[in-house]
């Protein structure tokens, strides 16, 4: 199973200009039922959309509709951050703190035994996760970042 990072779900948006062909090709080779999102990814998307709605309402409105479609498409496959996830996340900050959202996404993936799919592989270094970068056409199915 794959936990898609924010940059991946954003890249896969239909009609996105300059969409990376490697990412689309990677996604098309996988059964979509294996794709999951973290509630933290929804937070990041929502934050970006709210900011865009303030400065460019038509574009913000278009992305709001896109996000509604994402939530519908991923119904039952959006993983929450829970009381079981919290200690896993806390441990990822010891001995070296990392950005909270990255740690929360990593902890969610660890809790469920999922791989993380991201362009920002260094954000998940030393977590013990299998990390996939679909922008690299030569990326193996799993790269261990432990």
What are the language-model segments listed below?
Residues 132-138:
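Short beta-strand->loop
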Residues 9, 42-45, 86, 124:
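A generic structural signal for short hydrophobic patches within well-formed alpha-helices
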Residues 47-53, 61, 72-119, 144-146:
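Active-site neighborhoods of divalent-metal-dependent phosphate/nucleic-acid chemistry enzymes
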Residues 4-5, 38, 98-99, 120-121, ...:
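Histidine- and aromatic-rich ligand-binding microenvironments
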Residues 18, 36, 40, 58, ...:
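Residues at secondary-structure transition points
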Residues 1-37, 51-69, 138-140:
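Short, well-structured N-terminal submotif of metal-dependent ribonuclease cores
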């Amino acid at each position: 199973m794959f936990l898609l990072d924010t940059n991946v779900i954003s890249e896969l948006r239909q009609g996105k200009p300059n969409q990376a062909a490697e990412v689309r090709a990677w996604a098309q080779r996988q059964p979509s039922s294996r794709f999951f999102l973290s509630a933290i990814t929804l937070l990041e998307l929502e934050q970006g959309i709210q900011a865009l709605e303030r400065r460019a309402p038509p574009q913000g409105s278009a992305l709001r509709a896109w996000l509604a479609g994402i939530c519908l498409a991923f119904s039952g496959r959006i993983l929450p951050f829970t009381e079981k996830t919290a200690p896993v996340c806390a441990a990822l900050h010891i001995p070296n703190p990392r950005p909270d959202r990255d740690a929360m996404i990593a902890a969610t993936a660890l809790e469920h035994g999922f791989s993380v799919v991201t362009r920002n592989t260094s954000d998940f270094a030393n977590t013990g996760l299998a990390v996939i970068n679909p922008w690299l056409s030569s990326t193996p199915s799993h790269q261990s970042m432990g």
